[in-house]
Regions:
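Compositionally biased, intrinsically disordered low-complexity segments enriched
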Residues: 14-15
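Residues lining hydrophobic/aromatic ligand-binding pockets adjacent to catalytic sites
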Residues: 3, 19-254
Length: 254
């Protein structure tokens, strides 16, 4: 018998978008990752401007190129193959392998994995719009998918690509420069960056106020899973909950 995970109503969800002080201008900055998890969209929804950090070096076997879904209740990794000549270049210059080598197979995997879901067409539309045509720029395709999901979830936060900005510098200096160029008063950071921000002395560099994202993904029912599998791609959340409940799940404010 499949274990039934608690529904959203069964336990509280941390919804920082509802209690962050928003009298100032909040900037969030992230690399354009591949089919990102729900927390990525919570970060976007909690900011006034979101920046795709596409000027960093592409790393092999990173979240820029891979993520996880459920297949028959079991965690399954999906990844996009890279043109080897672009590994190590800035992300905005990275290219995937020719689309015919991976797009059709990956789409079929998604379609079969979530064939049970009445929300699959909405999700595949987002995937198709980003990855089915156009150039092979990894950053462009990832950003296009993220923008399509934001549109589906009615998240209206404007997006900016760091590669179109003047800001530069290493690590924290670059983040501060981006915030300053956008007149940001608060930098909203994922908690996973806390160690390197502390190492860089972010709060002593004369930049914006630093605030950390507070998002804990609540369990939701997952078909055939024997227990809740957390931090999967937003695709899994959408296919199980649908757009309206996914919007509530990530704490997007009206």
């Amino acid at each position: 018998m499949n274990a039934v995970a608690p529904t959203i109503a069964d336990r509280p969800i941390f919804v920082p978008g509802f209690f962050y002080a928003r009298s100032d201008r909040v900037i969030a900055i992230m690399q354009p990752t591949f089919l990102p998890w729900a927390g990525y969209f919570h970060l976007i929804a909690s900011s006034d401007t979101f920046v795709f950090l596409d000027t960093v070096q592409l790393e092999k076997q990173s979240w820029q190129t891979r993520n996880r879904i459920l297949v028959n209740g079991t965690e399954h990794r999906v990844s996009v193959p890279l043109d080897r000549q672009t590994i190590g270049l800035p992300l905005q210059q990275a290219q995937t392998r020719p689309r015919q080598e991976w797009f059709g197979k990956m789409r079929q995997t998604l379609a079969q994995a979530y064939a049970f879901s009445p929300f699959l067409p909405h999700t595949l539309d987002c995937f198709d719009s980003a990855y089915s045509e156009g150039d092979l720029s990894l950053a462009r395709m990832n950003a296009a998918f993220i923008a399509a999901i934001c549109n589906l979830l009615d998240i209206a936060t404007p997006h900016v690509h760091a590669s179109t900005m003047k800001a530069n510098g290493a690590r924290s200096e670059r983040l501060i420069a981006i915030c300053q160029e956008l007149n940001g008063e608060t930098y909203l950071s994922p908690r996973g960056a806390a160690d390197y921000l502390a190492e860089d002395g972010f709060d002593r560099l004369g930049g914006p106020a630093l605030q950390f994202q507070d998002f804990t993904p609540a369990p939701y029912p997952q078909k055939r899973a024997t227990g809740f599998v957390s931090h999967l791609s937003i695709i899994d959340v959408l296919c199980h909950l649908g757009p309206a409940e996914t919007r509530a799940y990530i704490g997007a404010t009206p």
